[in-house]
Amino acid sequence: MVRKMKLPFLNKNTSSSSFSSNSSSSSSSWPWPSSHQQNLKTISSKASFIVNKPKDVYEPEPPPRSFSSSPSSSSYSSFSSTSHAIENPPEIESIENVIKGLKSSKRLIFERRGTSNSILEEATKRDDHEEEEDGLMLLSLESNDPYTDFKNSMEKMVEVHVLHHDWISLEKLLFWFLKVNVKASHRYIFAAFVDLVLNLAVGPSKDVAGEPNSDVVVEDSLSSSWPVSLYSSSDENSSTSVRFLPETSIGEKGRDVCCLSSLFELEEKIKDNIDPNDYVSS
């Protein structure tokens, strides 16, 4: 009796051949292309696009020509004018011409109010203008003899405004001298004012006709021998004297008896910034 022996390698070849035949039949029967073929096709199309792209960018196709008369001529003229404007741009306007145009159109207004742009200068000019409106003009001088200068200036004011018997006006005069001068000059002002009042009380006074007083020494306040100075030194030999030059006659004439009030009380009132018009001697 003969037995059939099963050989494994024979079965393997048979199965492999059958698998290959099945795969070939399945591949032939599959209607869609494989992914490998699709990828190859996509890459090739991209490569062709990359190759053709520079040609499309750097070599533009010429515009189509039209045989009509008016539209073609207008389009050609516009194209030529645009190209001419690009090739020849307008010249940039210079800075000097721009500034001249702004000045002519009054957009830039240049005002020079003084020698500098200092706020203190404007405040000083404003104060001087107010003092001129009140009938007085402030003059600052650097003097080597402040007592004599203060006394002569006070005598000038008394002589011009006829303040011989008007004690209220004399007190206002002393008030303004103390106000506009530094504290180091107050002792010279007090001494000059006391001597002025004593001379007015003892010496012959001015009559109604307007005859000058023989005891009053008048000196021109605008003498050029003193240099003009804004600030004064605290030295005893040199101080700044500030005078009032008369412009219009102020005050009222009277024949009240002169009496010297407390000068120290008046100085305290000056420190408290009291208006001299409200101050009346007791």
Curated annotation (Swiss-Prot):
Q: What is its main location?
A: nucleus
From start to end residue, where is composition biased (Low complexity)?
A: 15-35, 66-85
Q: Name the InterPro entries for this protein.
A: Ovate, Ovate_C
Q: Which Pfam families match?
A: Ovate
Q: Identify the keywords attached in UniProt to this record, alphabetized.
A: Nucleus, Repressor, Transcription, Transcription regulation
Residues annotated as region Disordered?
A: 1-85
Listed under GO biological process in this entry are: negative regulation of DNA-templated transcription
**Domain OVATE: from-to ranges:** 139-199
Tissue specificity of this protein: Expressed in roots and shoots.
Q: Which GO terms describe its cellular component?
A: nucleus
The cellular location(s) given in this protein's UniProt record come to:
Nucleus
- Composition bias, Polar residues: 36-47
Per its database record, what is this protein's job?
Transcriptional repressor that regulates multiple aspects of plant growth and development through the regulation of BEL1-LIKE (BLH) and KNOX TALE (KNAT) homeodomain transcription factors.
Extra facts: Plants over-expressing OFP18 show small rosette size, late flowering, reduced fertilization and blunt-end siliques.
Q: What is this protein called?
A: Transcription repressor OFP18
Name its species: Arabidopsis thaliana (Mouse-ear cress)
